[in-house]
A protein has these predicted regions:
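The start of beta-strands in P-loop NTPase/AAA+ ATPase cores
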Residues: 5-7, 64, 185
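Active-site metal-binding loops of divalent metal-dependent hydrolases
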Residues: 11, 46, 190-191
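Active-site phosphate-binding/coordination module
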Residues: 18, 23-114, 210
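Conserved acidic, metal-coordinating active-site core of Asp-based
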Residues: 97-201
Length: 251
């Protein structure tokens, strides 16, 4: 196994949730030798401003990059052009009215608050949707001229995203931009919208103990995935220790 050069983690339910565990993760991260410490990427459904606010209220280490809106935004504080370069390859902003006209016929669906929306992410609540219902919504969107895909997680959160966007695609783009291999990357998460990170060829994964079955079932039995016996940030620490310590040392 190659050294870990980039670590991409979801926030809520993964490194965020229990502040004491989050503080232990920050301490662990700071204890890694600076010269070999991986780049830290937060990869959340939260929009970037929301993540920056969260950083002020919970004891997280500072990230090198922030991916927001389920892979539709990418930011680094000292590299403003990066965000534009990333979003420009995702295509034009959605027509919110077209999406709303499709969704109005879906029983039980409701629009999420404004803080979860932006031009390339239309987010809705829909409880316990099955695959057929999701496929039908996606087909109707495409029939109405909305070139989009659906990411559904937690049996509740439905995100309409550009065809080229999800948490995994954002990591692939960033790794390519940085010249880092996916086989030098570790990812961590707890729900279905994290699955796209785990599906990347060559990555190593950490699934926390409190993860939903939609992610655990995907990771079970895969040699490059570990399901940690601890929850949230404590599970992340265990998983990272496993993958960092299992790196081949040069002979």
């Amino acid at each position: 196994l190659k050294p870990v050069r980039l670590f991409s983690t979801d926030l809520d339910g993964t490194v965020v949730g229990n502040d004491e565990a989050t503080a232990r993760f920050r301490e662990f991260w700071g204890s890694l030798p600076e010269e070999t410490r991986p780049l830290l990427v937060f990869n959340s459904g939260r929009l970037i401003d929301d993540q920056l606010e969260l950083l002020d209220s919970v004891p997280l280490p500072r990230p090198d990059y922030i991916i927001g809106g389920v892979g539709t935004m990418l930011s680094r504080q000292d590299e403003p052009r990066l965000s534009q370069a990333y979003t420009s390859q995702l295509g034009a902003a959605f027509d919110a009215d077209k999406i709303a006209s499709v969704m109005k016929d879906v029983p039980g669906i409701s629009l999420q608050p404004d803080r979860y929306q932006h031009g390339l992410k239309s987010s809705w609540y829909l409880h316990d949707a099955d695959d057929d219902m999701l496929a039908d919504i996606e087909r109707r969107l495409n029939d109405n001229g909305v070139a989009a895909r659906i990411v559904y997680s937690s049996a509740r959160d439905l995100d309409v995203l550009p065809l080229a966007a999800d948490k995994g695609a954002a990591i692939r783009w960033l790794c390519n931009h940085l010249g880092i291999g996916l086989d030098e990357t570790v990812v961590a998460g707890d729900t279905g919208n994290d699955r796209a990170m785990f599906e990347l060829t060559g990555v190593r994964g950490v699934v926390v103990a409190n993860a939903l079955e939609e992610l655990k079932s995907f990771a079970t039995g895969k040699h490059n995935m570990i399901i940690a016996p601890k929850e949230e940030a404590d599970g992340v620490i265990m998983g990272l220790e496993h993958w960092i310590s299992s790196v081949e040392t040069p002979k």
